[in-house]
């Protein structure tokens, strides 16, 4: 693929992440379940808020994987990041579809989330592959924790959302393990704490906006 073709492909990914229209290569989990099964207004609103948070997380994931893939020194790491990024695109499409089914919308702050995450990913990439992969692993670990907490509060009747979140959780675990196996280092505790604080701001805002 030429440099121009790569640029067009990456720009298309960025546009689909921010504006919408992501395509999934895998079927949407829970697609055989009833879309709004016995959800009252409050339950649907809560489910939509959580799925919006998850959608923002996938917007950020696209930015992180794109920027870190651009700066990866090792071609094998680039391939690994590309594979994980494609599965994250599935997640993005699933969340987007579920938000539409719930009569809601993605976060209005998606351009901000994408730009900020892209910049952070560039910084991680500049630090070198081992630190960049460590950042991926820690990010996926925190996302896994968020998804587990969502499974605890999503309405039991919302089988479609729950199926999506559970499959995302499984994928995130695999992505984090792949990053560590590829040579990622465990990030220092202060860095983990800063990442957790930033994540808290993002999830709180995305739930509402």
Swiss-Prot record:
* Names of the cofactor(s): Fe cation
Q: Which UniProt keywords apply?
A: Cell membrane, Iron, Membrane, Metal-binding, Monooxygenase, Oxidoreductase, Ubiquinone biosynthesis
What Gene3D superfamilies does the record tag this protein with?
1.20.1260.10
What EC number(s) are associated with this protein in UniProt? 1.14.99.60
UniProt: Fe cation 2 binding residues? 88, 140, 172, 175
- Residues annotated to bind Fe cation 1: 58, 88, 91, 172
Under the heading InterPro entries, the entry gives: COQ7_proteobact, Ferritin-like, Ferritin-like_SF, Ubq_synth_Coq7
* GO MF: 3-demethoxyubiquinol 3-hydroxylase activity; metal ion binding
Where found? Answer: Cell membrane
Q: In what way does this protein cross or attach to the membrane?
A: Peripheral membrane protein
Please give the pathway this protein is involved in.
Answer: Cofactor biosynthesis; ubiquinone biosynthesis
Swiss-Prot/TrEMBL GO biological process terms = ubiquinone biosynthetic process
Catalytic function, reaction form: a 5-methoxy-2-methyl-3-(all-trans-polyprenyl)benzene-1,4-diol + AH2 + O2 = a 3-demethylubiquinol + A + H2O
Where is it found, in Gene Ontology cellular component terms?
A: plasma membrane
Query: Which note does the record give on the cofactor?
Result: Binds 2 iron ions per subunit.
- Describe the family membership recorded for this protein in Swiss-Prot or TrEMBL: Belongs to the COQ7 family.
Query: What's the stated role of this polypeptide?
Result: Catalyzes the hydroxylation of 2-nonaprenyl-3-methyl-6-methoxy-1,4-benzoquinol during ubiquinone biosynthesis.
Which PANTHER family does UniProt cross-reference here? 5-DEMETHOXYUBIQUINONE HYDROXYLASE, MITOCHONDRIAL, COENZYME Q10 BIOSYNTHESIS PROTEIN 7
By its UniProt entry, which NCBIfam families does this protein fall under?
Answer: DMQ_monoox_COQ7
State the protein's name.
3-demethoxyubiquinol 3-hydroxylase
**Organism in which the protein naturally occurs:** Polynucleobacter asymbioticus (strain DSM 18221 / CIP 109841 / QLW-P1DMWA-1) (Polynucleobacter necessarius subsp. asymbioticus)
